C-alpha cells in the first residue's frame, strides 16, 4: 500500500488540461477580506511555498480541535454546574481560527505572486478545507455544549451534516458545470465564529444561557443560522447555478444519474451512520460524540476528496467509496446486538482506520501529482534544478 497510486493515468492527463475556474460573489469576501488578504500576503517572503501556508493553517485548525478536546472532551464544560473552559483558551482559539482563515485566504494569492500556481495547489487547498469542516463544527459546539442550556449531541450531528453537504454542493456544482461557485457561508461563518470565541472569553459562557429575544436562546440562533444559511443561501444558489448551466447547455453531463453519482457515497454515509446511532445498544453518540463526529467527518472528507480529484481531472466520480464497506459491516454487527465496550472498540477502531486511510490517500495523491508536475509540494525549488546542481557539483563547476 505504501506505493499505491490513487490517481489514474487518465486523471493525470486530465490534470494537465485543468484550468482554475471559480466565481466568488460574496460581498464580505470581495470588499473586506480580499483587500485584507492582498495586504497580508505582502508580509510573506517570496520563497515561501503556498502549500506550506495552506498546511500551516490546517494545523492551527487541528490544534484548536485538540485544545478544546482537552478542556471539554464530552461537551459539558459550558453547561451549568460544570468546570468551564478557561477564558484564555477561548482567546487562543479565536485568534488561531482567524489566523487559519487568513492563511487559507492568502495561499492562492501567494501562488500567483510567486508564479507557482498548479492544480496540486488547488487540490491541496480544497482537500484540507474539506477535512477542516468537521474540526470547525465540533470546536464551535463547545461554546454551547450539551445539557439543558445547550444543543443535544444528535442535533449537533444533524447540523454537522448540514455543513458537510453545504461544502460538497459547491464541488458537485463544478463537477457538473465546470465552474466552482464559492459558497457564501464559509467566509461569514469564519469571521463570525472567530468573533464569538473572543466574546465568550469576555462575557463568559453564562451569557449564552440567557434568551436574547422573545425567549429565543442563542443556541437556537446558532442552529437557525446553520440551517437557514444552507436552505436559504447555499442550496438555492447551487440549484440556480445548475439550472442556468442546464438552460445554457453547458452541463458536462447529460445524464441525471451521472450528475448525481458524486452524492451517492455521502448519502450512504449519512444513512449508515444515522442507522448506527438509532440502532446502537449503548447509545454510542451519547457515549463518544466527539469520536463519532470525527469518524463521520473523516469518511466524508475522503469521499469529497475523490470528487475533487474527478472534477479537476474531468473524469467520472466513483459510485462507492470503499470506506463505507467496513462501516456497513460494523452497523450490521451493532444491529445484531453487542456489548457496550465492544461497540466502543468498534468505533475507535473504525475511526483510526478511516484516519490512516485518509492520510495515506492524501499523501499518495500529493506525491503522485508532485512527481507528475515535477515540483516539490512544500518548496518552490524545482527537482530538475536540484539534479542540475548535483551534476555541476560532480563535474567541478
UniProtKB/Swiss-Prot annotation:
Cofactor: Mg(2+); Mn(2+)
EC number(s) per entry: 2.7.8.1
Entries under PROSITE patterns matching the protein: CDP_ALCOHOL_P_TRANSF (PS00379)
Subcellular location(s) of the protein: Endoplasmic reticulum membrane
Pfam families: CDP-OH_P_transf
TM ranges: 47-69, 84-103, 123-145, 150-172, 179-201, 221-243, 256-278, 291-310, 317-339, 344-366
Single Gene Ontology MF annotation: metal ion binding
InterPro entries assigned: CDP-OH_P_trans, CDP-OH_PTrfase_TM_dom, CDP_ALCOHOL_P_TRANSF_CS, CHOPT
Signal sequence segment: none
Cellular component terms (Gene Ontology): endoplasmic reticulum membrane; Golgi apparatus
Alphabetized UniProt keyword annotations: Acetylation, Endoplasmic reticulum, Lipid biosynthesis, Lipid metabolism, Magnesium, Manganese, Membrane, Metal-binding, Phospholipid biosynthesis, Phospholipid metabolism, Selenocysteine, Transferase, Transmembrane, Transmembrane helix
A single BP term in Gene Ontology: phosphatidylethanolamine biosynthetic process
Topological relation to the membrane, as annotated: Multi-pass membrane protein
Pathway: Phospholipid metabolism; phosphatidylethanolamine biosynthesis; phosphatidylethanolamine from ethanolamine: step 3/3
Positions where N-acetylalanine occurs in the chain: 2
Reaction(s) catalysed (UniProt annotation): CDP-ethanolamine + a 1,2-diacyl-sn-glycerol = a 1,2-diacyl-sn-glycero-3-phosphoethanolamine + CMP + H(+); 1-O-alkyl-2-acyl-sn-glycerol + CDP-ethanolamine = a 1-O-alkyl-2-acyl-sn-glycero-3-phosphoethanolamine + CMP + H(+)
PANTHER family associated with the record: ETHANOLAMINEPHOSPHOTRANSFERASE, ETHANOLAMINEPHOSPHOTRANSFERASE 1
Function: Ethanolaminephosphotransferase that catalyzes the transfer of phosphoethanolamine (PE) from CDP-ethanolamine to lipid acceptors, the final step in the synthesis of PE via the 'Kennedy' pathway. PE is the second most abundant phospholipid of membranes in mammals and is involved in various membrane-related cellular processes. The enzyme is critical for the synthesis of several PE species and also catalyzes the synthesis of plasmanyl-PE, a lipid required for proper myelination and neurodevelopment, from 1-alkyl-2-acylglycerol.
Family: Belongs to the CDP-alcohol phosphatidyltransferase class-I family.
Name listed for the protein in its UniProt record: Ethanolaminephosphotransferase 1
Organism: Pongo abelii
Amino acid at each position: 500500500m505504501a506505493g499505491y497510486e490513487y490517481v489514474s493515468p487518465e486523471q493525470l492527463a486530465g490534470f494537465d488540461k485543468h484550468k482554475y475556474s471559480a466565481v466568488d460573489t460574496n460581498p464580505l469576501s470581495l470588499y473586506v477580506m480580499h483587500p485584507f488578504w492582498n495586504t497580508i500576503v505582502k508580509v510573506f517572503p517570496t520563497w515561501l511555498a503556498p502549500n506550506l501556508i495552506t498546511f500551516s493553517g490546517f494545523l492551527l485548525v487541528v490544534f484548536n480541535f485538540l485544545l478544546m478536546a482537552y478542556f471539554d472532551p464530552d461537551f459539558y464544560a459550558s453547561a451549568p454546574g460544570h468546570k468551564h473552559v478557561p477564558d484564555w483558551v477561548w482567546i487562543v482559539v479565536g485568534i488561531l481560527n482567524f489566523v487559519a482563515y487568513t492563511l487559507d485566504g492568502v495561499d492562492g494569492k501567494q501562488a500567483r505572486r510567486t508564479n507557482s500556481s498548479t492544480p496540486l495547489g488547488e487540490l491541496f487547498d480544497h482537500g484540507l478545507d474539506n477535512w477542516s469542516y468537521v474540526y470547525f463544527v465540533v470546536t464551535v459546539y463547545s461554546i454551547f455544549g450539551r445539557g439543558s442550556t445547550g444543543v443535544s449531541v444528535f442535533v449537533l450531528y444533524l447540523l454537522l451534516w448540514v455543513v458537510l453537504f453545504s461544502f460538497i454542493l459547491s464541488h458537485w456544482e463544478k463537477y457538473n458545470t465546470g465552474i466552482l461557485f464559492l459558497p457564501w457561508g464559509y467566509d461569514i461563518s469564519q469571521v463570525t465564529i472567530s468573533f464569538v470565541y473572543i466574546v465568550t472569553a469576555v462575557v463568559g459562557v453564562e451569557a449564552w444561557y440567557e434568551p436574547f429575544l422573545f425567549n429565543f436562546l442563542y443556541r437556537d440562533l446558532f442552529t437557525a443560522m446553520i440551517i437557514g444559511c444552507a436552505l436559504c443561501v447555499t442550496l438555492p444558489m447551487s440549484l440556480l447555478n445548475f439550472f442556468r448551466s442546464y438552460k445554457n447547455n453547458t452541463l458536462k453531463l447529460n445524464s441525471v444519474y451521472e450528475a448525481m453519482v458524486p452524492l451517492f457515497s455521502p448519502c450512504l454515509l449519512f444513512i449508515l451512520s444515522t442507522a448506527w446511532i438509532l440502532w446502537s445498544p449503548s447509545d454510542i453518540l451519547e457515549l463518544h460524540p466527539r469520536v463519532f463526529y470525527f469518524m463521520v467527518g473523516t469518511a466524508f472528507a475522503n469521499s469529497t476528496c475523490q470528487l475533487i480529484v474527478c472534477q479537476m481531472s474531468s473524469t467520472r466520480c466513483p459510485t462507492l467509496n470503499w470506506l463505507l464497506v467496513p462501516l456497513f459491516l460494523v452497523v450490521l454487527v451493532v444491529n445484531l446486538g453487542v456489548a457496550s465496550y465492544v461497540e466502543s472498540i468498534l468505533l475507535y477502531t473504525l475511526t483510526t482506520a478511516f484516519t490512516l486511510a485518509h492520510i495515506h490517500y492524501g499523501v499518495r495523491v500529493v506525491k503522485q501529482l508532485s512527481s507528475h508536475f515535477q515540483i516539490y509540494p512544500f518548496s518552490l525549488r524545482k527537482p530538475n534544478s536540484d539534479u542540475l546542481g548535483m551534476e555541476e557539483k560532480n563535474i567541478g563547476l
